[in-house]
C-alpha cells in the first residue's frame, strides 16, 4: 500500500511504501528551501537527483550530498536541510 504525505505547505512530498528489497521506505521530492525534520527511528537518506546541504544534530559543520550519495540520521533526533534546487530522495527506515 502506498502512503502519500505532504509537508511544509506542499514543498516536500513523499510516497511511503514497503518492499522486500528496501524494507520500509519513502521516496519524495523537496522544493528549494530550508527544512527541519525529526526522526522516530534511524534513517538512511539517499539523494536520487539534485543535492542536499545537511546538518545532523550534534554536528557543527554542514555537509553537501550529491545524487548517488547517502547519509544516516540517528533515531529520535532532528536534522536540518538546505535545498538549493528541486531534489529527489529515497529514505529507508532502519532498525535502531
Curated annotation (Swiss-Prot):
It comes from the Bacteria. CDD domains: cupin_PpnP-like. It catalyses: a purine D-ribonucleoside + phosphate = a purine nucleobase + alpha-D-ribose 1-phosphate; adenosine + phosphate = alpha-D-ribose 1-phosphate + adenine; cytidine + phosphate = cytosine + alpha-D-ribose 1-phosphate; guanosine + phosphate = alpha-D-ribose 1-phosphate + guanine. Keywords: Glycosyltransferase, Transferase. One of its GO terms (molecular function) is purine-nucleoside phosphorylase activity. Belongs to the nucleoside phosphorylase PpnP family. Catalyzes the phosphorolysis of diverse nucleosides, yielding D-ribose 1-phosphate and the respective free bases. Can use uridine, adenosine, guanosine, cytidine, thymidine, inosine and xanthosine as substrates. Also catalyzes the reverse reactions. This is Pyrimidine/purine nucleoside phosphorylase. It comes from Erwinia tasmaniensis (strain DSM 17950 / CFBP 7177 / CIP 109463 / NCPPB 4357 / Et1/99). The gene is ppnP.
Amino acid at each position: 500500500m502506498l502512503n502519500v504525505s505532504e509537508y511544509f505547505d506542499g514543498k516536500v512530498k513523499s510516497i511511503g511504501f514497503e518492499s522486500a528489497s528496501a524494507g520500509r521506505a519513502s521516496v519524495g521530492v523537496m522544493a528549494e528551501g530550508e527544512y527541519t525534520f525529526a526522526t522516530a527511528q534511524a534513517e538512511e537518506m539517499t539523494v536520487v537527483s539534485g543535492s542536499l546541504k545537511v546538518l545532523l544534530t550534534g554536528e557543527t559543520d554542514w555537509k553537501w550530498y550529491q545524487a548517488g550519495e547517502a547519509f544516516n540520521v540517528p533515531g529520535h533526533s532532528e536534522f536540518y536541510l538546505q535545498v538549493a534546487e528541486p531534489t529527489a530522495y529515497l529514505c529507508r527506515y532502519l532498525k535502531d
